[in-house]
Amino acid sequence: RRQRQMCIRDSKKAKIPFGRLLLQTPSEPRTSIPDFRTLRNLPLETFSPNLEQTLAASESRLDWYTDFAEEEGVDGPSFLGWADTSNNPEAIADRTKEVLGLAAETFLQGPDKVKTLCGVLEDSGILVSRNSIVESTTTRPLSIDEFRGFTLIQASYALIFINTRDSKTAQLFSLSHELGHVVLGQPGISDHGESRDIERWCNRFAASFLAPASLVLSTVSPSDSPFDSVKTLSRKSGMSQEAALWRLVHLNIIDEGEASKLRPLVAPQPVQAMEPSSNKGGPARHRVVKARVGNRFFEAVTYATVAGKIPQREAAQLLGAATADSLSKLIAHSPSAEWRAS
């Protein structure tokens, strides 16, 4: 009995189900999502408990939303799976921007480009979740060394998850990269590496989506120094200086030799994102929850609750509300009565 208690204690500390500790051979993570992450060009084959639980929670949300949307007659994104890696990523990026209603001749607008793009993607029918921790557990941070984002696809619906432990510029690139996965109809866990064909394609797609070639050429002046060109493109596109540098190299505006000199100047600095809280001075609770589960999912659940389509207990579980009062407060901050999913 004492040994069993010790095993249970150890399983809780390791965030591993007790039954898995009893197996002679460690079990594989319970997910079928393709893993495109690499380390030194070799595939990664492990999932931390934090990543595994984040994947499981996201899969559950997409499962629920898929059933709900199909019953309500709500379509998924019209561009899901409309391309493959044989297509030119720049041409597909231009076409995707057009379908999303984004002007080809301008960069993403607004002081918070991540928020802007999240809104555009959710309006198109994609679920977008952002978090830097496992659900609401602040003692379990997500690691950007393990993953930057992932895309889940079920039937004609998709969910994008972004690790907000990353910098804002990296989050923006991740959103665009994961959009590439949606366009390809290819779910997966991403790290923006270059050793996999799909990841390379999605990187090119993201760079083209955020900084279309014609727009870059009209923005960067031939009289600018290479570093000034990098800073200008980074500021206007929302990409990191490193991503802007390689976009300019790809467009033959900066040569490889000059780029190698600039690399130390544009190398990303480690960022430790602070998890928003509903405490005094932080965002309100409903804003935190909306970011974690996504506006579209939040409004679908609250609409279904108010309309009597699902019980409050299920809604509370889907939104992570601990009490009926917490759920009521979340519902009060949703335009659920006027929600339009299409």
Where are these regions (language model features)?
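Active-site hotspot residues in diverse enzymes, especially metal/ion-binding acidic/histidine motifs
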Residues: 1-342
